[in-house]
Design a protein with these regions (language model features):
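Outer-membrane beta-barrel channels and translocator barrels
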Residues: 77, 116-119, 165-167, 204-209, ...
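N-terminal periplasmic/intermembrane-space "pro-region" immediately following the signal or transit peptide
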Residues: 2-107, 111-118, 324
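Outer-membrane beta-barrel translocator/channel fold
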Residues: 209-240, 285-363, 426-444
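Sequence/structural signature of outer-membrane beta-barrel proteins
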Residues: 89-95, 130-135, 175-186, 220-224, ...
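Outer-membrane beta-barrel "beta-signal"
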Residues: 247, 366, 408-412, 438-453
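Residues that define the transmembrane beta-barrel architecture of outer-membrane proteins
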Residues: 78, 102-106, 152-156, 192-196, ...
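Outer membrane beta-barrel
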Residues: 112-230, 249-256, 326-335
Length: 453
């Protein structure tokens, strides 16, 4: 605990000395974020896939006399944005064998976006880096640094994007703006996953019966602490050099939503994902959201279409006055462990340590979170997660005991003022195996997004 608190305190000092004052801060757009304030804010994996725009062009953020002087410039130059995103992360894990993985890193990114050219086209880039502040045993295994526990820098984004119409957008190049169920930025370390390819994103204009769609091809992935892009097939463990064709759609009608996503990687595997959600309107202050999902995986190596595991999941989320309760259940078939080579699996019962679904496994998870807005502490929240995993396929040579996990979170994300969006998190995680032994973790994170121009 002492090391975690030192990481937070020292990281804050470093951040405050490293940044320039800004009149307004942008909220941190990060996958692992503070818990939702209500049930309807709890995004499913398919919901997070679809936004009206995958990326946005630069917008004029300068005010006053300087803004007037820039009026004569083309929008491509005038609306240029630079955003500094400092980040510090402390990670400490001890597994049942006594192996320790510990590191404290400082880094972040500098993002560039141009304004619009011809009212449609713009470019963007983002440079990432992570440097060690402290390296404990097996620092490279924490994924905060390179596999050798050293610093790294990488150009993670370099793309061109265009608004084809008010409802359609295309992006091509290297980008991190992918948040689909089985391919996502997975931004839970210092640097997110980045993908190389092209995507078309769009939606119908009817808000009452809206269809969102996403199609494209992802040829390569740069994983979180890597500096090179590799074929999607190789990230999935194959020696082939193929990419992944992706197609996804989500239809929303009032309180109901249903969708699917398909991932086809030639010579490797096919993943099909289906999901549905129902958000009924209840009398205030109560809210409810019911969701279901199904994953089917098939191997394309050797016998085409050979079944891999499938998983069925259900989830109920209820809330009242900033208190949110989540109850989830999943069941994985006995064909094998659920595979998710390009992101965290979208399983409802995935926790911090137990982040895979084993063959034959049943899992139940409960989470209770609370935001302290009513007590004059906006931005402060706590969450507790408890999960139990049982009946995984076990053999004499590969025992798979039942497991229990508990995760505790404390978050503070400054809601307004000159430090708006500055986010602090401390978490403590435990996993116990029925056969004996436990894994423990401390994590401490500080993150901010600071518009420079």
């Amino acid at each position: 605990m002492q090391r975690a608190l030192l990481a937070l305190a020292a990281g804050l000092v470093l951040l405050l000395f490293a940044v320039l004052p800004a009149s307004a801060q942008m909220p941190g757009q990060i996958i692992v974020a503070p818990p939702p304030e209500s049930a309807d804010q709890k995004e499913t994996a398919l919901e997070s896939s679809f936004r009206e725009r995958l990326v946005e062009p630069g917008r004029l953020r300068i005010t006053g006399d300087l803004a007037k002087k820039l009026e004569g410039l083309p929008a491509f130059l005038r609306d240029t944005n630079f955003t500094f995103k400092p980040r510090t992360y402390y990670f400490d894990q001890v597994d049942p064998s006594g192996k320790t993985e510990e590191a404290w890193a400082l880094g972040g990114s500098l993002e560039y976006k141009s304004g619009l050219a011809w009212d449609r086209l713009w470019v963007g880039a983002e440079f990432f880096g992570s440097w060690p502040l402290n390296t404990g045993p097996n620092a490279g295994d924490t994924l905060l640094l390179t596999s050798q526990g050293t610093s790294y820098t990488v150009l993670g984004q370099a793309y061109v994007a265009a608004n084809l119409s008010e409802t359609n957008q295309v992006i091509a190049g290297d980008f991190t703006s992918v948040d689909t169920p089985y391919a996502s930025r997975q931004f839970n370390r210092m640097t997110p996953n980045a993908f190389q390819g092209a995507l078309l994103n769009g939606f119908t204009s009817d808000e009452q019966h809206r269809l969102h769609y996403l199609v494209g091809y992802l040829g390569k992935i740069k994983e979180r602490n890597a500096t090179d892009f590799v074929p999607m097939s190789q990230a999935a463990g194959s020696s082939a050099s193929t990419g992944t064709a992706i197609g996804a759609a989500r239809y929303t009608r009032g309180e109901f939503a249903v969708g699917l996503a398909e991932y086809y990687t030639a010579q490797v595997m096919n993943i099909a994902y289906l999901a549905a959600a129902y958000t009924p309107k209840l009398a205030a202050p109560y809210e409810l959201k019911l969701s279901a999902q199904f994953t089917d995986e098939r191997s394309l190596a050797g016998a085409s279409g050979t079944p891999l595991p499938n998983q069925l999941g259900i989830e109920a989320v209820g809330s009242r006055d900033f208190a949110v309760l989540t109850l989830s259940f999943t069941q994985t078939s006995s064909a094998g462990n659920l595979s998710s080579p390009w992101s965290d699996a979208p399983s409802y019962t995935r926790a911090e340590i137990h982040d895979t679904s084993r063959a034959g496994e049943n899992a139940a998870l409960g989470m209770l979170s609370y935001h302290f807005n009513r007590f004059g502490l906006p931005g402060v929240s706590v969450a507790a997660v408890g999960a139990y995993y049982w009946d995984a396929v076990t053999t004499t040579s590969n025992p798979q005991p039942n497991q229990t996990e508990v995760d505790l979170y404390l978050d503070y994300k400054i809601p307004n003022g000159s430090l708006e969006g500055l986010w602090f998190r401390v978490e403590r995680n435990w996993e116990w195996s029925a056969g004996g032994g436990q894994t423990t973790q401390w994590r401490a994170i500080i993150y901010w997004e600071i518009p420079l121009i």
